[in-house]
């Protein structure tokens, strides 16, 4: 099975993490299906049951992120943040495991909350907290998406910007995954939101945007064959 879909942060211009309506929420999901996508990675957020229910009924596989542990002492000491992360992993899985659309649990994103400078014990414990809570061999555990891999879980994942890529893993033959790519900016007057911009690559018009996106999707097909 070849999975293809977006990293979906579930942010809204006015409600932030809260969608303005059910119709607006599922519109995004329907567009994914209309574009030929068969999965969505829910990034650093846990959605409501209605969102999952739509995915259940319409055949959209969900990769569910564990919201990353904090840094900078925002909710207490470093140790408290770590312990809270392990606990929340179990609670998130317990609260959502009944949704058949969830195909994988994603533990870590780009070393957020991993604290690699402290060694890999915390990273491995975080992965193990998800493995132990999973209780379902039919669901994958995606230990680390991007950056600091620890040879655990079912995936070997890279983040490749702007063009997609993937890595082979002859050691234990984990699933090759390009967890993130793209980041194409096209600035349109009247559709901009104030704030800093993440700039991987920028184009000046819609035709260039579409052509570049086509090149990236062609590259994905090459990776699939490899």
Each model region followed by its residue ranges:
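N-terminal carbohydrate-binding accessory modules
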Residues: 1-33, 53
């Amino acid at each position: 099975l070849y999975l293809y879909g977006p990293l979906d942060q579930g942010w809204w211009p006015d409600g932030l993490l809260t969608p303005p309506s059910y119709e607006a929420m599922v519109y995004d999901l329907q567009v994914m299906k209309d574009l030929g996508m068969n999965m969505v990675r829910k990034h650093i957020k846990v959605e409501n049951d209605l969102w999952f229910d739509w995915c259940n009924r319409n055949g959209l596989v969900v990769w569910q992120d564990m919201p990353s542990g904090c840094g900078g002492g925002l909710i207490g000491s470093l140790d408290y943040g770590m312990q809270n992360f392990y606990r929340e992993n179990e609670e998130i899985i317990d609260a959502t495991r009944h949704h058949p659309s969830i195909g994988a649990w994603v533990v870590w994103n780009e070393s957020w909350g991993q604290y690699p400078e402290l060694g890999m014990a915390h990273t491995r414990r975080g992965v193990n907290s998800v493995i132990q809570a999973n209780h379902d061999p039919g669901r994958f555990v995606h230990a680390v998406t991007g950056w600091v891999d620890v040879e655990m879980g079912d995936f070997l994942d890279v983040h490749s910007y702007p063009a997609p890529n993937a890595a082979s893993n002859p050691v234990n033959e984990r699933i090759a995954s390009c967890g993130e790519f793209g980041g194409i900016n096209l600035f349109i007057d009247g559709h901009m939101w104030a704030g800093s911009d993440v700039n991987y690559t920028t184009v000046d018009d819609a035709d260039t945007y579409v052509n570049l996106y086509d090149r990236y999707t062609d590259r994905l097909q090459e990776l699939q064959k490899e």
